[in-house]
Amino acid sequence: MPEKSEIIKLSAYLVIISYVVCVICIGIAIAKSPWFSFPYNWLSELGNSNEGNTPVVDGILVCHVFNAGLMLGGLGGMAFSYGMYLSNIFKGKKGMLAIALFFLAMVFIFLTGFFSQDYGILHTISAFSFFFLVPLSLLAISLSTPGWTKLALRIVSVASLLAFVLLFVDRPWGSNSIVEFVPAIALGVGIILIVRMILSPNRVSATQPASQDRESN
């Protein structure tokens, strides 16, 4: 059975890879959708099979590329939440709350891709839940982190929360998808900070079983 530290490392690599893949899928969907406009379109429209006669890339509908990217990102994030649980950083009620909020955020980004915009209200609920949970989870995670990492997480969580509020405000200048990108970027920054923290040598060694320590002595 894999050691705890190895599972933590694997979950960290998975979340980074899945996040990058998700961003690439979104980028492909944008690049291959000439009708898409940052000021006026929502990102979710890229996942709508009826939007702008969705183009085909190598035999695959662009909407499926977009939705698959969201689902892969969510799966990687869910795996990472288990790695967070195994680490010795998030303890007590605050720590468990932080992990639970992060896990739920990842569940809802998965559901945002699973229930594409074609599904109407199911997609809307999933997407808005994700945008709401991202700042909450990052803020909760900051309560279990020290120093500048705490400050950085709080800054990106506040930025993400402001973006969430803007989703409900009439914006004559448009920028629909740009507002959506803020929590996505905040999540990416948060993931990097958390991965850096749980993969630090001291943290990883702290997760080694006590029996191994005794054997080494």
Model-derived regions: residue spans:
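Membrane-interfacial loop-to-transmembrane-helix junctions in polytopic alpha-helical membrane proteins
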Residues: E3-L14, P55-V65, F90-L97, F115-S126, ...
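N-terminal signal-anchor transmembrane alpha helix
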Residues: E6-P34
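Transmembrane alpha-helical segments in integral membrane proteins
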Residues: L14-I17, L70-I89
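Interfacial/capping segments of alpha-helical transmembrane domains
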Residues: A31-S44
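Interfacial helix-start motif at the membrane-water boundary
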Residues: N48-L75
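Cytoplasmic juxtamembrane regions at transmembrane-helix boundaries
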Residues: A79-A105
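Membrane-proximal helix-loop-helix units in multi-pass membrane proteins
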Residues: L101-S142
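Terminal transmembrane helical module of multi-pass membrane proteins
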Residues: L139-N217
